Amino acid sequence: MDTIIASRELQVERKHFSIEFRENERGRFLRITEEAHGRRNTVIVPSTGLNEFNAAVDAVIVAANASNASSNVTPAA
C-alpha cells in the first residue's frame, strides 16, 4: 500500500494533472498522472532520480521560454 507524503493537483486546458510524492515497501517515488479525454497516463520517477528529473524539466522550460521570447520579437520599423 502506498503512503502519500505530498500531493498537488492542477488543471491545464482539458487536462487534469496529479503530482504525488509517495512511499511504499520498495521506496519513495514521484508519481505524475495526466487524465484527459477519459485516458490516464502515469510517469513514475524514483526518489534517487528526482534531482536529475527536475534539472531536465528546468532545462526544457528554459529552452522553451527562450524560444518563445525569440519568436515574440517584433522587427523594428
Label for each model-derived stretch:
Residues M1-A77:
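Positively charged, low-complexity terminal tracts
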